[in-house]
UniProtKB/Swiss-Prot annotation:
Predominant subcellular localization, coarse grouping: cytoplasm
Any Gene Ontology CC annotation: cytoplasm
Superkingdom, taxonomy of origin: Bacteria
Gene3D superfamilies for this protein: D-tyrosyl-tRNA(Tyr) deacylase (3.50.80.10)
Protein's gene: dtd
Entry GO MF terms: D-tyrosyl-tRNA(Tyr) deacylase activity; Gly-tRNA(Ala) deacylase activity; Ser(Gly)-tRNA(Ala) hydrolase activity; tRNA binding
Name of the molecule in the record: D-aminoacyl-tRNA deacylase
Keyword Cell division (UniProt): no
Pfam families membership: Tyr_Deacylase
Similarity remark: Belongs to the DTD family.
Motif annotated as Gly-cisPro motif, important for rejection of L-amino acids, chain positions: 138-139
Subunit structure comment from the entry: Homodimer.
Length: 150
């Protein structure tokens, strides 16, 4: 499981010119699911995401977490995070999980992070062409792979 985390002042998802969801200050998470991902990958990432100290304290140091600031979260599925560009110029997505497995894991991830935050999170729609608007804060962008826990 792989995430791209972006600290935002606000973000939104639009589908077919209709606003689907939006958040204020918090995190926009792009979530990629791999074929062999499990609950332990979800648990690792959720704990890491909600506790990452990437928000500024009153001295301007990144010392506060999403939980500390009571921020919001928007989670968008992103199978292209597992793109392979090893051969040729057309990316291969063979490592990305098939929908039948990915959708339940995406829903579990969203439910688990919502529970960890004690609030409802916002989401995109799986397997749908979405327009994402965001205002980066910083910018701060962090990539985490549950299989590479550096």
């Amino acid at each position: 499981m792989r995430v791209v985390i972006q600290r935002v002042l606000k973000a939104s998802v639009t589908i077919n010119h209709q606003l689907k969801s939006s958040i204020g200050q918090g995190l926009l998470i792009f979530l990629g699911i791999e074929e062999n991902d499990k609950q332990e990958d979800i648990d690792f990432l959720v704990k890491k995401i909600v506790n990452l100290r990437i928000f500024n304290d009153n001295k301007g140091a990144m010392n506060r977490s999403l939980l500390d600031i009571e921020g919001e979260l928007l989670c968008v599925s992103q199978f292209t995070l597992f793109a392979s560009t090893k051969k040729g110029n057309r990316p291969s997505y063979i490592r990305a999980s098939k929908s039948e497995k990915a959708i339940p894991l995406y829903e579990k991830f969203c439910a688990t992070i919502s529970s960890a935050m004690s609030k409802i999170i916002q989401t995109g729609t799986f397997k749908t062409n979405m327009k994402i608007k965001l205002i980066n804060d910083g910018p701060v962008t962090i990539c985490i792979d549950s299989k590479n826990r550096e």
